[in-house]
């Protein structure tokens, strides 16, 4: 029986750290691809890759390049998957592809669009790549699986919405209703392993705790002490007014808007399908 071969793109990223080792431990033969191995935009032409792969797991994002470059990378990645007879492409997306104003969202919820979003940078790149893959995936001879995690924690990485101050005081970027789904890196890796091994996957998986915890309650549980919040009418209302008056760019306003994300996000279908419980 031949060894099952996996390609990891972006294997040196924070989220991918340790994933190669897990796959090897589970009996897979693993190749990795990063910037030192060649041009992402021409990955389909890279002669160093194997003749075939069972699955490709993509963590890579070209953060310092344009949206167009990132979509071009997706085109090259898809072509490489065709050439290498890949059975499934697992694309690491983000919960940032959703509008902050859906109210409730699950694995079937529509994503935001490049035309509609006020975000720039990472979030907009992820939306653009998701849009591209969704627009043509029906023509692929392989399975495309979108993985949308919350904020990934590991190695004592602090939650980005908690700012520690002296004397046991912390400030959260938001108010008591604000939410930010989170997930442990080890749980991300376990879910990806299950996705690789599954005969048939959901089109989209949500990787984050299914407990609807608010930023405020998360801060109380993890850092304790005195937790201060930022009033929405000041820290979202004033920037919104400035944006409407042409004094603030939409992309900058979207950062304030995101601080008051009240979406109730569910990973119920993911936990059921993969028989996993995000902790």
Residues covered by each model-derived region:
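Catalytic helix-loop patch of NAD(P)-dependent Rossmann-fold dehydrogenases
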Residues: 102-147, 151
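C-terminal amphipathic/interface module of NAD(P)-dependent oxidoreductases
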Residues: 213, 227-229, 248-279
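Conserved Rossmann-fold NAD(P)-dependent oxidoreductase catalytic core, especially the SDR/UDP-sugar
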Residues: 76-121
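Mid/C-terminal beta-alpha module of Rossmann-like enzyme folds, strongest
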Residues: 191-250
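Glycine/proline-rich active-site loop of Rossmann-fold NAD(P)-dependent oxidoreductases
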Residues: 127, 140-143, 152-163, 194-205, ...
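N-terminal Rossmann NAD(P)H-binding glycine-rich loop of SDR-like oxidoreductase domains
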Residues: 4-26
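NAD(P)H-binding glycine-rich loop region in Rossmannoid oxidoreductase-like domains
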Residues: 42-83, 98
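NAD(P)-dependent short-chain dehydrogenase/reductase
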Residues: 137-181, 185
């Amino acid at each position: 029986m031949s060894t099952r071969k996996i390609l990891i793109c972006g294997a040196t990223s924070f989220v991918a750290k340790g994933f190669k080792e897990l796959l090897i431990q589970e009996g897979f033969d693993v190749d990795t691809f990063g910037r030192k191995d060649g041009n992402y935009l021409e990955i389909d032409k890279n002669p160093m890759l194997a003749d075939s792969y069972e699955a490709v797991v993509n963590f890579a994002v070209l953060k310092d390049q344009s949206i167009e470059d990132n979509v071009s990378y997706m085109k090259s990645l898809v072509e490489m998957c065709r050439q290498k007879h890949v059975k499934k492409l697992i694309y690491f997306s983000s919960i940032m592809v959703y509008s902050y104003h859906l109210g409730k969202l699950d694995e079937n919820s529509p994503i935001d669009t490049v035309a509609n979003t006020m975000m720039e940078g990472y979030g907009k790149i992820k939306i653009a790549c998701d849009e591209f893959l969704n627009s043509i995936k029906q023509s692929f001879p392989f399975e495309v699986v979108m993985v949308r995690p919350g904020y990934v924690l590991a190695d004592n990485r602090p939650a980005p919405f908690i700012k520690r101050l002296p004397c046991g005081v912390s400030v959260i970027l938001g108010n008591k209703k604000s939410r930010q789904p989170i997930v442990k890196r080890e749980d991300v890796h376990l879910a990806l392993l299950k996705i690789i091994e599954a005969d048939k996957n959901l089109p989209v998986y949500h990787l984050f705790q299914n407990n609807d915890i608010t930023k405020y309650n998360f801060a109380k549980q993890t850092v304790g002490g005195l937790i201060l919040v930022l009033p929405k009418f000041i820290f979202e209302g004033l920037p919104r007014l400035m944006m409407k008056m042409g004094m603030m760019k939409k992309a900058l306003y979207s950062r304030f808007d995101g601080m008051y994300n009240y979406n109730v996000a569910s990973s119920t279908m993911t936990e059921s399908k993969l028989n996993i419980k995000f902790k």
